[in-house]
A protein has these predicted regions:
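Short Pro-Cys-Gly-centered "Cys-loop" motif that presents a nucleophilic cysteine in a tight turn
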Residues: 1-53, 66-203
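Short Gly/Ser/Thr- and Asp/Glu-enriched loop/turn motifs at secondary-structure junctions
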Residues: 56-60
Length: 203
């Protein structure tokens, strides 16, 4: 059966998720996560897309990406293929690494964007030793939101989301962290219950 066409807008903002096949960890160690972020930075410079948030976990990763005129299928294919080549060579394996190509969903509103950002940054709570200190997790963009200087690869544009809050930067950081805590305490019926991506496959 043919795949449903991916819904795309070259000026849209997307929730993108990548996941490894079931028996494989996508990131076995922090060196793998570092390599993936290097590749993300490489292709960001080439395609000029913007990243508003990310969280790299064990078997999967989430991103908020503004395509900024680029075709998400093209740059995600480049990123995933490059990482799979690195991974297979490093671990002496062959075959597919990713489950499907990637999942994507257009962000329809500012309120959805804020909830999505909170959802993605709260993913770190499921990592051992980070349930009560998600802001300490190194492979999430939350650290950049709370300390803009903490953005060594220049990957993340925090201004788009933070500008939805207060003009005062310190107050904005406080308000954003309060949003995360509110999301964590009131998850029922929120975005985390509705991330199905069921119609978002490439052909």
């Amino acid at each position: 059966m043919p795949r449903t066409a991916r819904i795309k807008d070259n000026n849209g903002i997307y929730h993108i998720m990548i996941r490894s096949i079931s028996e494989v960890q996508l990131f076995k160690c922090n060196a793998d996560r570092d390599k993936f972020l290097e590749l993300l930075a490489k292709y960001q410079k080439l395609y000029l897309f913007k990243i508003y948030g990310f969280c790299l976990l064990g078997s999967h990763a989430h991103f908020i990406i503004a395509s900024n005129g680029a075709d998400i299928s093209k740059f995600m294919k480049s990123i995933n293929q490059s990482y799979a080549f690195y991974y297979n060579k490093k671990y002496n394996r062959h075959g597919h690494l990713f489950q499907d190509r990637f999942k994507s969903k257009l962000v329809p509103s500012y309120s959805y964007l804020l909830t999505l950002s909170a959802y993605i940054h709260n993913n770190a709570k499921d990592i051992p030793n980070y349930s009560k200190r998600i802001e300490k997790y190194a492979y999430s963009s939350l650290k950049t939101y709370l300390n803009v200087s903490n953005n060594p690869l220049g990957l993340v544009d925090v201004s788009y989301i933070l500008n939805l809050f207060d003009d005062n930067f310190n107050e904005t950081k406080h308000n954003y962290f309060e949003l995360l805590k509110h999301y964590l305490e009131n998850k029922k019926g929120t975005l985390s219950d509705n991330l199905d991506f069921k119609n978002e496959h490439t052909k």
